[in-house]
């Protein structure tokens, strides 16, 4: 018998996550490691679990994610979006709840590029009047 798995792609800053949600007992695996192992910081673990907790599906699905690029915060955001999209694929009735919480919206904020003549994207060199 084929295992029914639901897929969602999440992106945040430079991070890209490919997330598979399978009916199971609530194991979350990211790049072959457990959630606590991959994201030792508690706040990032909370971010990843948010869509599951909001929809009361914590113990009902196993989550398997492959994530690359960006930093740890961007990766956590990407996994969250991927989980939310996969949950909607699994159960379309969850869409309004996740949409209202903003978990189905891709965060468009990206790093602004550095401009020539400036030290960073907006920071100017110090100007001396006299």
UniProtKB/Swiss-Prot annotation:
Q: What is one Gene Ontology biological process annotated in the Swiss-Prot or TrEMBL record?
A: translation
Q: Which InterPro entries match?
A: Ribosomal_Su5_D2-typ_SF, Ribosomal_uS9, Ribosomal_uS9_bac/plastid, Ribosomal_uS9_CS, Ribsml_uS5_D2-typ_fold_subgr
Which controlled-vocabulary keywords does the entry list?
Ribonucleoprotein, Ribosomal protein
Report the leader peptide range. Answer: none
Q: Which domain of life is it from?
A: Bacteria
Keyword Ribonucleoprotein: yes or no?
Answer: yes
GO MF term list: RNA binding; structural constituent of ribosome
Q: Which Pfam families match?
A: Ribosomal_S9
Assigned GO CC terms: cytosolic small ribosomal subunit
- HAMAP family assigned to the protein according to its UniProt record, in alphabetical order: Ribosomal_uS9_B
Tell me which family the UniProt entry assigns to this protein: Belongs to the universal ribosomal protein uS9 family.
The protein depicted here goes by the name Small ribosomal subunit protein uS9
């Amino acid at each position: 018998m084929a295992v029914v798995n639901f897929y969602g792609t999440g992106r945040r800053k430079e991070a890209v996550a490919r997330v598979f949600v399978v009916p199971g007992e609530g194991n979350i695996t990211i790049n072959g490691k457990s959630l606590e192992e991959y994201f030792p910081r508690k706040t990032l673990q909370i971010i990843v679990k948010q869509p599951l907790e909001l929809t009361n599906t914590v113990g009902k699905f196993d989550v398997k994610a492959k994530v690359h690029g960006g930093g740890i915060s961007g990766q956590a955001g990407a996994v969250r979006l991927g989980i939310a999209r996969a949950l909607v694929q699994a159960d379309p009735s969850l869409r309004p709840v996740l949409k209202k919480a903003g978990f189905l919206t891709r965060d468009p904020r990206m790093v602004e590029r550095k401009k020539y003549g400036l030290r960073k994207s907006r920071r100017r060199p110090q100007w001396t009047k006299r």
